[in-house]
Amino acid sequence: AVATIYISASVNTASATLGASAGLQLSGGTDGDAPTAAQLVTGLDLFETTYGAGAVAIPGSYSTTVWDGLLAHAVDKNRIALLAFDPTNTVDDSVTDAEDWIGTQTNTEYAGFYYPSITMTGSAETSLTISPEGYVAAKRSIAQNSVGAWQAYAGLNSKAGFVTGISTPIDKADSDVLDAGYINAIRVIQGSVRIYGARSASTDITNFRYITAREVLNYIVTEAEKRLEDLVFSTIDGRRTVFGRVEARLIGLLEPLRREGGLYEAFDSEGNQVDAGYSVLVTDALNPVTQLATGTVKAKVGVRVSSVADRIEIEIVKSNLTASVV
């Protein structure tokens, strides 16, 4: 047989070496420039109130302009702002950046910080380093859809499936430093990447140490609005019929949260329930006749949101053979 096609290869020498792989921002074209931080923030306006509660992020952008915009949007729309740091930041850099920014803000319980960046496998088995907000948002979605707004998206609940590692090694000491600086660490635990914190960026640790407190309130606010929408333009009669209907719908919203563990019930020393972890008031005191004459009906809801067990302490006492076990 005679080959009809031959491929010949030869080795040549050259003085130039292959160029290193690097990111390049194109310029001089007609498709515009890279968006500015202000333009990215403006884009948040497309996420209208009708989308309900949720989380927002601008991965890859770490300026205070972006953080300001995300927080303002979250407060206005009852959402959570997921914030991260430049991949080159150290633990101390990130704590400084977070604390400096938090000191200039209010309502920071609507935001959560996450560090460090994460790694995952790209095309051709390459390793990519990316901002962690997408990973956090995915685990948040799973936790809330499978359990509820009170479920922390941390620990085993955040075990990664496709994330292969983290850009900066984080040990327990680092995690504690980050936690004290209002930042949730991302760590490798038992061979898997996990979010190892459930705190908000709030300095009001009595009420909003945990991001789940704000998550539950966001859920209640948005769901209450939906459930009461059908009662708008109801007749206000002397029997206060609309009062009862408003109260029933709010209880119908809150009771499942209590039953499933999202609200913390109070019991006395004998195990008798003191309260259900929530209260609903639609009373004459809240609704004087002069107010009803203007068409406004007011209700008052109180809730006690369940907490998060982010630390388990065990005391182990060793006894000798002649002593009783403590």
Spans of model-derived segments:
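Structured, hydrophobic secondary-structure cores that serve as assembly/anchoring elements
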Residues: 42-326
